[in-house]
Amino acid sequence: MRRYLSIIISSLFATTLLTSCSSNSNLPFNQGFVPSCAGLDASGISTNELLLDCLDGSGAVNFYSIRGPIVVNVWGSWCEGCRQEMPYFVELYQNKLFKNGEIKLLGVDIEESSRQVGVNFIKTYGMSWPHLEDLAGKTKILFGPGAPVTWFIDKDGKVLNKHIGTYTDPDQLFTQVEKAFGVKL
């Protein structure tokens, strides 16, 4: 009996040691981090007001005051299409034009049951750009019901293009960014 107990304990210890020390290089570099909205340019002047809280808990931002160039992706963790296309946005954000801030990326999480559900989604997919939340459904008038929806907004706050539905491959997303902002990714 002692022998079997010793084998079981040794096996459990080895399993714990091996799994806790292994790394998963497929995970995004920032898994577990909820980005701040501090880098958003919300300096635009607008007579409209649509206050949305940042998912990092740092406060509210008036959506109508955000200036681009910026890609705004409306998503929800419950949305199958959002889960499908999110790796494309993660890839897009790795591009130098996004990394150096020439073009910004903003997520808007809608229709969640709680903030934590959205935070968990961000952590799971490694979404390292700022995200606003709309638990109350205030953005339905602006974005329409459902997700995903992606907007392309210029430096003056003008909507250049709107894509309704799921991106089926990264090239489709990258091409729309290039056309909207006149850049080469």
Where is each model-derived feature located?
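N-terminal targeting signals for export/organelle localization
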Residues: M1-D53, T175, K184-L185
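Extracytoplasmic
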Residues: I45-T47, I66-R67, N100-I103, G126, ...
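Active-site-proximal beta-strand/loop segments in catalytic clefts of secreted hydrolases
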Residues: V74-G76, V108-E111, D134-A136, H163-G165
